[in-house]
């Protein structure tokens, strides 16, 4: 797309060597599981996005190949191929083999650059068994190849001249090293979600993904940028005003973009990004937005006498944000990331900039669009009234529990340990399974809470109504950290919550209802990795005095074939947890030595919000469509 040659070997700065990467890969890409594997693709794509941010690229193609490799192609300026003075090697080779070598550290070649770990393609090279690069620049096509990070020097060559009108650009194709990664199989959906997000955040850049293994493909191009992102997130919701509110500004080299739309939902959905990174832990940009939003809404509401119902109180932030979908995107030349997972923006100056932009532009928008302002404020007033009712309900609950002999729910069989780090709570479907679990557990560190039937669907109710539900109240009390905005993970009584439901449709529904409650009202538990789903076996196979458990039909068939010579003594199918006696339940599902647990994680909060809304919200159409689209992906079928 661009022939701009400001970006050459002279702009490539080198900060440190590559030796440690293969020894400690997790330090550089976070982990060596599926998340780390996909991070490799994001590192390469981030380079192409940086070219786009600098105005030199508007098309990026990602392809998953049948041989397990992945390639990323862009139409940017092409990685420099001229000789690097310090190393006396081609700049391309330096970028690929030296950690932190790149044109992103002097703010001249790139004003803004993404990439959470910022480790660049050299780490991708170090963690690949093989990597190939094709560069189109300086009037020619160049290729180079690397094996386990080592340059195959004789393979750096100028292949041919560029054709007249042919685009410049870079293609990187790599094969992840299966000696390092737990899995080397890329997941189309995981990549699709991230690439869609990047296309929303970088309007006008076309990003395509194709999968040779399945012939699946997707192309994303959003001229409306984060405006369209908000529309996408609200697809299954009812908006309170037609147009998405959008404003942007630049101050001190920091770009701010904000889009929002209020809906009639009870859950808000606010997503903040810094340099294209999903800042899941929030940060100064989010704080600035929330503070200014609450102030602007209260200023407008007070000046138009709209808060008479609240007995002189102002609206709180949580009232204003109820049902609000918003995307905040800042681009910063020198972002500082903090927090446990380095996904919290720490630059203090950003708060003031976002506050002032929001105060000024949203205030003006409200004055010019009184109908929209009224719709948003009426919803917030309704939320404030419900919050006050919920407070009364909570106080009532607290008073009630203080009168009871113990503040813990009667049906909780607690564990002896008082150390949350070694304690686990099994949340069990049904009293009969609860009885078996209580008898089969190790009471030193395992607590059991049986739940009767299906709990309330919290997606459709406010907190005051939720707190009226006995089963939910018992669960909140047992976990111990409170609920909603006041939830405090430090006060949680267990660091493992294990959802134990039957392996049928009802069990899956109950598990989804529980996850909705935990995600919406105790989300830190999921973010800290405290929530698990038990995986009880579906089948038990006996043969000549030996017992084998199978999680699914495929495993059952393999056991029958390989362990029982095709002729088992007995095959038992567990229809429900209640069918297992205490010993079987301990043996298959509760014993830490041999049980299988599935940790519940949230990779992408925007996708999770949308998913809970589709599955548990009011709109039937999107749910039907989702079931239709994913019927073939189901992991089990209940007959």
Curated annotation (Swiss-Prot):
<keyword id="KW-0413">Isomerase</keyword>
<keyword id="KW-0238">DNA-binding</keyword>
<comment type="similarity">
    <text>Belongs to the type II topoisomerase GyrB family.</text>
</comment>
<keyword id="KW-0547">Nucleotide-binding</keyword>
<feature type="site" description="Interaction with DNA">
    <location>
        <position position="454"/>
    </location>
</feature>
<dbReference type="InterPro" id="IPR036890">
    <property type="entry name" value="HATPase_C_sf"/>
</dbReference>
<dbReference type="InterPro" id="IPR018522">
    <property type="entry name" value="TopoIIA_CS"/>
</dbReference>
<dbReference type="Pfam" id="PF00986">
    <property type="entry name" value="DNA_gyraseB_C"/>
</dbReference>
<dbReference type="InterPro" id="IPR013759">
    <property type="entry name" value="Topo_IIA_B_C"/>
</dbReference>
<feature type="binding site">
    <location>
        <position position="504"/>
    </location>
    <ligand>
        <name>Mg(2+) 2</name>
    </ligand>
</feature>
<feature type="binding site">
    <location>
        <position position="502"/>
    </location>
    <ligand>
        <name>Mg(2+) 2</name>
    </ligand>
</feature>
<dbReference type="InterPro" id="IPR011557">
    <property type="entry name" value="GyrB"/>
</dbReference>
<dbReference type="Pfam" id="PF02518">
    <property type="entry name" value="HATPase_c"/>
</dbReference>
<dbReference type="GO" id="GO:0005524">
    <property type="term" value="F:ATP binding"/>
</dbReference>
<comment type="subunit">
    <text>Heterotetramer, composed of two GyrA and two GyrB chains. In the heterotetramer, GyrA contains the active site tyrosine that forms a transient covalent intermediate with DNA, while GyrB binds cofactors and catalyzes ATP hydrolysis.</text>
</comment>
<dbReference type="InterPro" id="IPR013506">
    <property type="entry name" value="Topo_IIA_bsu_dom2"/>
</dbReference>
<dbReference type="GO" id="GO:0005737">
    <property type="term" value="C:cytoplasm"/>
</dbReference>
<dbReference type="GO" id="GO:0003918">
    <property type="term" value="F:DNA topoisomerase type II (double strand cut, ATP-hydrolyzing) activity"/>
</dbReference>
<comment type="function">
    <text>A type II topoisomerase that negatively supercoils closed circular double-stranded (ds) DNA in an ATP-dependent manner to modulate DNA topology and maintain chromosomes in an underwound state. Negative supercoiling favors strand separation, and DNA replication, transcription, recombination and repair, all of which involve strand separation. Also able to catalyze the interconversion of other topological isomers of dsDNA rings, including catenanes and knotted rings. Type II topoisomerases break and join 2 DNA strands simultaneously in an ATP-dependent manner.</text>
</comment>
<keyword id="KW-0963">Cytoplasm</keyword>
<dbReference type="InterPro" id="IPR020568">
    <property type="entry name" value="Ribosomal_Su5_D2-typ_SF"/>
</dbReference>
<dbReference type="GO" id="GO:0006261">
    <property type="term" value="P:DNA-templated DNA replication"/>
</dbReference>
<dbReference type="GO" id="GO:0003677">
    <property type="term" value="F:DNA binding"/>
</dbReference>
<dbReference type="InterPro" id="IPR013760">
    <property type="entry name" value="Topo_IIA-like_dom_sf"/>
</dbReference>
<feature type="domain" description="Toprim">
    <location>
        <begin position="423"/>
        <end position="537"/>
    </location>
</feature>
<keyword id="KW-0479">Metal-binding</keyword>
<feature type="region of interest" description="Disordered">
    <location>
        <begin position="392"/>
        <end position="417"/>
    </location>
</feature>
<feature type="binding site">
    <location>
        <position position="502"/>
    </location>
    <ligand>
        <name>Mg(2+) 1</name>
    </ligand>
</feature>
<feature type="site" description="Interaction with DNA">
    <location>
        <position position="457"/>
    </location>
</feature>
<dbReference type="InterPro" id="IPR000565">
    <property type="entry name" value="Topo_IIA_B"/>
</dbReference>
<keyword id="KW-0067">ATP-binding</keyword>
<dbReference type="GO" id="GO:0005694">
    <property type="term" value="C:chromosome"/>
</dbReference>
<dbReference type="Pfam" id="PF00204">
    <property type="entry name" value="DNA_gyraseB"/>
</dbReference>
<keyword id="KW-0799">Topoisomerase</keyword>
<dbReference type="Pfam" id="PF01751">
    <property type="entry name" value="Toprim"/>
</dbReference>
<dbReference type="GO" id="GO:0006265">
    <property type="term" value="P:DNA topological change"/>
</dbReference>
<dbReference type="InterPro" id="IPR034160">
    <property type="entry name" value="TOPRIM_GyrB"/>
</dbReference>
<dbReference type="InterPro" id="IPR002288">
    <property type="entry name" value="DNA_gyrase_B_C"/>
</dbReference>
<feature type="compositionally biased region" description="Basic and acidic residues">
    <location>
        <begin position="392"/>
        <end position="402"/>
    </location>
</feature>
<keyword id="KW-0460">Magnesium</keyword>
<dbReference type="GO" id="GO:0046677">
    <property type="term" value="P:response to antibiotic"/>
</dbReference>
<keyword id="KW-0046">Antibiotic resistance</keyword>
């Amino acid at each position: 797309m661009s022939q701009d040659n400001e970006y050459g070997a002279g702009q490539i700065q080198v900060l440190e060597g590559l030796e440690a990467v293969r020894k400690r890969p997790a330090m550089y890409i976070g982990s060596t599981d599926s998340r780390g594997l996909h991070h490799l693709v994001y590192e390469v794509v981030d380079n192409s996005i940086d070219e786009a941010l600098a105005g030199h690229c508007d098309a990026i193609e990602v392809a998953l190949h049948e041989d397990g490799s992945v390639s990323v192609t862009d139409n940017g300026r092409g990685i420099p191929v001229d000789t690097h003075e310090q190393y006396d090697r081609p700049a391309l080779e330096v970028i690929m083999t030296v950690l932190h070598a790149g044109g992103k550290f002097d703010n001249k070649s790139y004003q803004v650059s993404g990439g959470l770990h910022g480790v660049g393609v050299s780490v991708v090279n170090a963690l690949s068994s093989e990597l190939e690069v094709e560069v189109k620049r300086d009037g020619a096509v160049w290729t180079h190849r690397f094996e386990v990070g080592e340059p195959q020097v004789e393979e750096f060559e100028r292949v041919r001249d560029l054709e007249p009108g042919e685009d410049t650009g870079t293609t990187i194709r790599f094969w992840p090293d299966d000696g390092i990664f737990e899995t080397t199989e890329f997941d189309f959906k995981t990549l699709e979600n991230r690439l869609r997000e990047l296309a929303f955040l970088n309007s006008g850049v076309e990003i395509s993904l194709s999968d040779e293994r399945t012939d699946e493909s997707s192309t994303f191009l959003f001229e409306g940028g984060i405006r369209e992102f908000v529309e996408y997130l609200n697809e299954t919701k009812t908006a309170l005003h037609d147009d998405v509110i959008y404003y942007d500004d630049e101050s001190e080299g920091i770009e701010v973009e904000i889009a929002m739309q209020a809906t009639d939902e009870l859950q808000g959905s606010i997503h903040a990004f810094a340099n294209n990174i999903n800042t899941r832990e929030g940060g100064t940009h989010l704080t600035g937005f929330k503070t200014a939003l609450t102030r602007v809404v209260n200023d407008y509401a007070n000046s138009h006498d709209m808060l008479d119902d609240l007995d002189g109180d102002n609206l709180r932030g949580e009232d204003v944000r109820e049902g609000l979908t918003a995307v905040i995107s800042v681009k910063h030349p020198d972002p500082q990331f903090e927090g446990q997972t380095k996904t919290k923006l720490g630059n203090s100056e950003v708060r003031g900039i976002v506050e002032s932009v929001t105060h000024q532009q949203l205030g003006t928008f409200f004055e010019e669009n009184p109908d929209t302002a009224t719709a948003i404020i009426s919803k917030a007033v309704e939320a404030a009234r419900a919050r006050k009712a919920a407070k009364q309900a909570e106080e009532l609950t607290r008073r009630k529990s203080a009168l009871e002999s113990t503040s813990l729910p009667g049906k909780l069989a607690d564990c002896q340990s008082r150390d949350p780090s070694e304690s686990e709570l099994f949340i069990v479907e049904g009293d009969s399974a609860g009885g078996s679990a209580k008898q089969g557990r190790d009471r030193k560190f395992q607590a059991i809470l049986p739940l009767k039937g299906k709990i309330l669907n919290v997606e459709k109710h406010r907190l005051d109504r939720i707190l009226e539900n006995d089963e939910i109240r018992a669960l909140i009390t047992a976990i111990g950290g409170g609920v909603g905005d006041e939830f405090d993970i430090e006060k949680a009584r267990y660091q493992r919550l294990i959802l134990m439901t039957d392996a049928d449709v009802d069990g899956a529904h109950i598990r989804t209802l529980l996850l909705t409650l935990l995600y919406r009202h105790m989300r830190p538990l999921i973010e800290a990795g405290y929530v698990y789903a038990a995986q009880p076996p579906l089948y038990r196979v006996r043969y000549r005095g030996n017992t084998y458990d199978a999680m699914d039909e495929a495993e059952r068939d393999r056991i029958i074939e390989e362990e029982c010579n095709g002729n088992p003594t007995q095959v038992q199918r567990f229809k429900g947890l209640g069918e297992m006696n205490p010993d079987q339940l301990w043996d298959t599902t509760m014993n830490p030595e041999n049980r299988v647990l599935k940790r519940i994680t949230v990779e992408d909060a925007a996708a999770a919000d949308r998913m809970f809304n589709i599955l548990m919200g009011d709109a039937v159409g999107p749910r039907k469509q989702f079931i239709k689209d994913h019927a073939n992906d189901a992991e089990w079928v209940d007959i």
